[in-house]
């Protein structure tokens, strides 16, 4: 308490007589003045629980009510014990002393404030840590108890809570004037700090008639909290708290928006529009706008990049080489579309040539059609015996040549020009390469060649019979007219003659190779396919036929 606010007891009585609405004890009165009040006529029961239910029962027999007395508790949780008033020393001159002592246990109700025998019972719930107090009307009387003590200065100016806010407050804490600047979740605020203290946005708005810390209805006799609640229906916000009117406006705007959206949905449903399908279509169109995204025709399948047939680097080098001969200088690597076009054209042309070569290969390998007969060979055997027409024609030619050769050799044997294969073994022994006669003849031939230096043919040294027969044949032909066969054929040594061709050729004289058809395209088929093309194929055809082997 500051010393500059001390007043005398007479000033306090005058203020009580003039303005019963507000009593402010800046300095406690003297003990003699306090004895004028009868504390036995004051029954103040303030039962405040954690659920913010305010029950105030005040029996007022006098016509004047003075200010509410409340106790603010800022610490959480704190239990208080009631102590008896202690004698006051004359130096302090403060007869009103409230001793607060912290109770470590959480339990039943405690008497927090005592005014010389008249106690204000404050009930503290064991489950909660918040304490709320309600105002109680104290009726000043005369000449009874001398131990009545008014409340301390720090707890005098407390707003009374209206019924509207008291029933809805849940986690509230009364805040004293000293701690008004630091309190956050506060509901009632003292009048001394109403102009300066900044409350939090969560603070509940106080009633409009409580700006002076007392209800306007306390002037009349028998006023209760119910009358205060009825008269203080209009509310205003304290500090930075938002007014309730703004919240009501926001709620109304939200309801209006909900009604508009519901009407819009009803209109869309009545028109037969499927919102889900429209959203899917819009999303698909957005995906199609992105580069590389699949189109609608592909049904979401990923587009595959085609690899060109010809390598762009080698193709551009070849084009640059050809264009350089025509005095055209161009970098074909920069024009990728041109390279792709040429590559696609080459691929189409090569596919055309390959198709023609395949058709020619099938015609070349096509065999003679066989008709199946009853009791004949199985179809598998007949298919294995199928040959091409060219192969069959070659076989027929070989057989005819063999027959002609056999007839010719047979005629030579009849004429005695060749030795028959059915003669005795002596002739075979004489003509044996390892016999003495053969070696002797070979030695004579070698000596003759060394001496004369000329080769002596066999018809010159085959015997005098052969040569003499020819000469005698001429003489005899002139004189006697002997036939040719006597000296020439009969007189000659026909046993020494042997057909070397038949011995080398074997039985038939020609080796036959059966050409089976194969599922492949050969060089001849490609050359035949290129012959149908007119431009740019002559040089390739010439090289192809040069490499073709029979």
From Swiss-Prot:
Residues 165-187, 227-239, 246-255 have a biased composition (Polar residues). Keywords: Coiled coil, Nucleus, Transcription, Transcription regulation. Belongs to the TAF4 family. One of its GO terms (cellular component) is transcription factor TFIID complex. Pfam families: TAF4. It comes from Lodderomyces elongisporus (strain ATCC 11503 / CBS 2605 / JCM 1781 / NBRC 1676 / NRRL YB-4239). Residues 1-29, 165-262, 287-307 are annotated as: Disordered. It is found in: Nucleus. The keyword Transcription regulation applies. Residues 380-412 form a coiled coil. Residues 316-396 form the Histone-fold domain. The 1.2 MDa TFIID complex is composed of TATA binding protein (TBP) and the 14 TBP-associated factors. InterPro entries: TAF4_C (IPR007900). The gene is TAF4. One of its GO terms (biological process) is DNA-templated transcription initiation. This is Transcription initiation factor TFIID subunit 4. Residues 206-226 have a biased composition (Low complexity). Functions as a component of the DNA-binding general transcription factor complex TFIID. Binding of TFIID to a promoter (with or without TATA element) is the initial step in pre-initiation complex (PIC) formation. TFIID plays a key role in the regulation of gene expression by RNA polymerase II through different activities such as transcription activator interaction, core promoter recognition and selectivity, TFIIA and TFIIB interaction, chromatin modification (histone acetylation by TAF1), facilitation of DNA opening and initiation of transcription.
């Amino acid at each position: 308490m500051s010393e500059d606010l001390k007043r005398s007891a007479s000033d306090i009585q005058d203020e009580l007589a003039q303005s019963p609405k507000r009593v402010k004890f800046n300095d406690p009165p003297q003990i003699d003045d306090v004895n004028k009040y009868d504390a036995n006529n004051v029954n103040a029961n303030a039962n405040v629980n954690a659920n913010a239910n305010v029950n105030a029962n005040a029996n007022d027999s006098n016509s004047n009510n003075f200010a509410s007395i409340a106790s603010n508790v800022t610490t959480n949780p704190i239990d208080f014990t009631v102590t008896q008033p202690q004698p006051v020393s004359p130096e302090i001159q403060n007869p009103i002393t409230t001793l607060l002592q912290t109770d470590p246990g959480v339990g039943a109700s405690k008497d927090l404030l005592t005014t010389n025998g008249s106690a204000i019972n404050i009930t503290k719930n064991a489950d909660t840590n918040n304490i709320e107090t309600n105002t109680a009307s104290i009726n000043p009387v005369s000449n009874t108890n001398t131990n009545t003590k008014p409340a301390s200065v720090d707890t005098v100016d407390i707003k009374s809570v209206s019924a509207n806010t008291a029933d809805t407050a849940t986690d509230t804490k009364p805040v004293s004037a000293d701690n008004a600047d630091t309190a956050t979740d506060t509901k009632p605020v003292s009048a001394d700090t109403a102009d300066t203290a900044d409350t939090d946005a969560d603070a509940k708005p106080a009633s409009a008639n409580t700006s002076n810390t007392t209800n306007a209805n306390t002037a009349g006799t028998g006023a209760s909290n119910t009358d205060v609640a009825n008269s203080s229906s209009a509310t205003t916000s304290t500090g930075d708290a938002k007014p309730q009117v703004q919240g009501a406006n926001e709620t109304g705007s939200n309801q209006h928006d909900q009604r508009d959206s519901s009407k819009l949905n009803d209109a869309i449903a009545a028109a037969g529009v499927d919102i889900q399908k429209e959203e899917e279509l819009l999303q698909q169109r957005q995906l199609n706008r992105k580069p590389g995204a699949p189109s609608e025709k592909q049904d979401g399948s990923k587009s595959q990049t085609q690899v060109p047939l010809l390598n762009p680097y080698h193709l551009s080098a070849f084009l640059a080489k050809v264009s350089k001969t025509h005095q055209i200088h161009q970098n074909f690597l920069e024009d990728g579309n041109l390279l792709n076009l040429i590559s696609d054209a080459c691929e189409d042309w090569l596919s055309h040539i390959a198709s023609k070569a395949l058709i020619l290969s099938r015609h070349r390998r096509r065999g003679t059609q066989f008709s199946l007969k009853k009791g004949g060979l199985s179809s598998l055997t007949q298919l294995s015996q199928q040959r091409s027409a060219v192969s069959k024609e070659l076989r027929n030619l070989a057989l005819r040549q063999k027959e002609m050769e056999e007839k010719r050799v047979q005629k030579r044997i009849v004429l005695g020009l060749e030795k028959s294969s059915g003669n005795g073994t002596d002739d075979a022994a004489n003509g044996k390469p390892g016999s003495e006669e053969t070696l002797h003849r070979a030695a004579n031939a070698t000596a003759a060649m060394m001496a004369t230096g000329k080769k002596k043919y066999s018809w010159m040294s085959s015997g005098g019979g052969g040569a003499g027969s020819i000469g005698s044949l001429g003489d005899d032909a002139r004189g006697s007219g002997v036939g040719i066969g006597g000296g020439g054929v009969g007189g000659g040594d026909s046993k020494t003659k042997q057909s070397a061709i038949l011995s080398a050729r074997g039985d038939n004289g020609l080796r036959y190779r059966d050409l089976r058809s194969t599922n492949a395209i050969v060089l001849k088929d490609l050359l035949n396919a290129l012959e149908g093309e007119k431009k740019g194929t002559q040089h390739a055809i010439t090289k192809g036929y040069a490499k073709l082997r029979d």
